[in-house]
């Protein structure tokens, strides 16, 4: 009876403590929030269980310990879920997704991939960057960007030949007294070399000068003292009167004036030839350039646009002299020695002797100069002479050495620009950079350095 009364008092005392704890937790939720109240509830519940364990009989301790453990675990899980931050949850998710996967059992059949998963897999494969060597990029650039298909090249060549024929017939009819030789194709069209683009062509207009009436004065012996230019002098005027040569009409003083000749031809080509009618017959539009000091024809055909330059060339013995009549020329009777035939012939001989890639490298370089505005002052003559100079220094010009030779050409060009002097391969006194201004050289040097340091930026460009 006494024990029963003691238990009732202990139970009443325990109920009082529980009521007080519930009151504290209810108010703590208002002050601390749900998470804080949960943590406080765990601690308070632990204290309460300790008090109950101390006052309860030994037979009830095991059941109460199990209930206590379960209550604490549930309260802890609830508190963690309520208290956990989004950052921690993301971290747990990441760890879950990044967990190592076990290898599938070979005996089990793999599930068949759906159409969507196959598309996603192919898209992911396409996104994987493919790394190419410089050698591979150069060959790809040569094939897809620096080479014109043979069919297109032949069509453009035939169009230029048709225009040449019309011009030739008109000049013979207009000036029968002038001993013009037959016009012929110049440049890559004339040599049937591979081309990087079809936006330009040239027609050579040979002027046959009598060797006993004309002589070439080297540039060093003229008042300009410039080896890049020469003059054509009329000789034996004491014994052969003026007018003995059909070219005497273009004399200024005792010298054959390139400017007077070009201006006379310009008037004929611009004002006397019915280019609209010729263009209609050839299915194109032909317009002579009336603003330029040079002889140019602008041709628009179904496949694109083309500029045809007409170059008067005096032929004296073994010298080919191009008329130099630009507005900035220091005199009106200047002629410039052309080594084009020798340049191309020498490159072809070298490539044939060692199965080289000099002409292929030339195509790539011409394409890069076309794609980079900063390299517009670098012309084909510069590139041909650089390749000829390097051919005397480097012996390996096989296709496997294309990348090395390409970088070497750029490096040599930068070196020559730094000196401001690129000697001609056939006459080391001639400076092929003499026509460039200081700002042109600076721009070229910067552009070449960019190509040399980051060639992929140029080679990956689309046409």
Curated annotation (Swiss-Prot):
Pfam families the UniProt entry points to: Mab-21_C, MID51-like_C
Residue ranges, compositional bias (Basic and acidic residues): 89-98
Segments for region (Disordered): 87-119
Mitochondrial intermembrane face of the membrane: 1-24
Keyword annotations: Membrane, Mitochondrion, Mitochondrion outer membrane, Transmembrane, Transmembrane helix
Membrane-protein topology: Single-pass membrane protein
Residues spanning the membrane: 25-47
GO cellular component assignments: mitochondrial outer membrane; mitochondrion
Cytoplasmic face residues: 48-463
Subcellular location: Mitochondrion outer membrane
Main location: mitochondrion
A GO biological-process term: positive regulation of mitochondrial fission
UniProt function note: Mitochondrial outer membrane protein which regulates mitochondrial organization. It is required for mitochondrial fission and promotes the recruitment and association of the fission mediator dynamin-related protein 1 (DNM1L) to the mitochondrial surface independently of the mitochondrial fission FIS1 and MFF proteins. Regulates DNM1L GTPase activity.
Further facts: Does not bind ADP or other nucleotides, in contrast to MIEF1.
Family: Belongs to the MID49/MID51 family.
Protein name per its UniProtKB record: Mitochondrial dynamics protein MID49
């Amino acid at each position: 009876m006494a024990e029963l009364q003691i238990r009732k008092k202990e139970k009443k005392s325990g109920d009082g403590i529980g009521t007080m704890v519930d009151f504290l937790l209810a108010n703590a939720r208002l002050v601390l929030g749900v998470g804080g109240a949960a943590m406080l509830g765990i601690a308070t519940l632990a204290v309460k269980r300790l008090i109950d364990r101390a006052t309860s009989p030994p037979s009830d301790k095991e059941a109460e310990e199990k209930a206590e453990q379960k209550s604490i675990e549930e309260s802890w899980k609830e508190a963690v879920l309520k208290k956990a931050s989004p950052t921690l949850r993301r971290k747990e998710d990441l760890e879950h997704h990044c967990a190592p996967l076990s290898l599938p059992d070979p005996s089990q059949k793999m599930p068949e991939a759906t159409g969507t998963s196959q598309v996603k897999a192919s898209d992911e494969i396409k996104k994987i960057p493919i790394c190419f060597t410089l050698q591979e990029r150069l060959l790809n650039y040569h094939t897809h960007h620096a080479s014109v298909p043979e069919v297109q090249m032949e069509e453009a060549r035939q169009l230029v030949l048709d225009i040449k024929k019309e011009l030739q017939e008109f000049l013979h009819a207009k000036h029968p007294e002038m001993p013009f030789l037959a016009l012929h194709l110049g440049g890559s069209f004339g040599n049937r070399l591979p081309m990087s683009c079809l936006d330009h062509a040239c027609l050579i207009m040979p002027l046959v000068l009598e060797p006993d009436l004309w002589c070439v004065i080297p540039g060093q012996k003229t008042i300009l003292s410039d080896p890049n230019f020469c003059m054509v002098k009329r000789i034996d005027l004491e014994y052969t009167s003026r007018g003995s040569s059909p070219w005497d009409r273009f004399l200024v003083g005792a010298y054959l004036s390139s400017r007077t000749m070009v201006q006379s031809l310009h008037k004929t080509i611009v004002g006397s030839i019915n280019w609209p009618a010729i263009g209609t017959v050839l299915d194109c539009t032909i317009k002579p350039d009336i603003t330029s000091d040079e002889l140019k024809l602008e041709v628009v055909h179904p496949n694109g646009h083309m500029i045809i330059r007409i170059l008067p060339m005096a032929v004296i013995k073994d010298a080919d002299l191009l008329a130099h009549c630009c507005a900035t020329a220091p005199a009106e009777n200047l002629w410039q020695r052309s080594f084009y035939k020798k340049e191309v012939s020498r490159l072809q001989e070298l490539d044939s002797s060692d199965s080289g890639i000099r002409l292929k490298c030339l195509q790539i370089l011409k394409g890069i100069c076309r794609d980079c505005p900063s390299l517009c002052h670098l012309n084909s003559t510069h590139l041909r002479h650089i390749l000829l100079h390097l051919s005397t220094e480097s012996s390996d010009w096989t296709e496997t050495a294309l990348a090395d030779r390409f970088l070497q050409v750029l490096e040599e060009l930068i070196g020559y620009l730094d000196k401001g002097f690129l000697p001609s391969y056939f006459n080391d006194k001639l400076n092929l950079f003499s026509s460039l201004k200081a700002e042109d050289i600076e721009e070229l040097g910067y552009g070449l350095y960019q190509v040399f340091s980051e060639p992929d930026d140029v080679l990956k460009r689309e046409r």
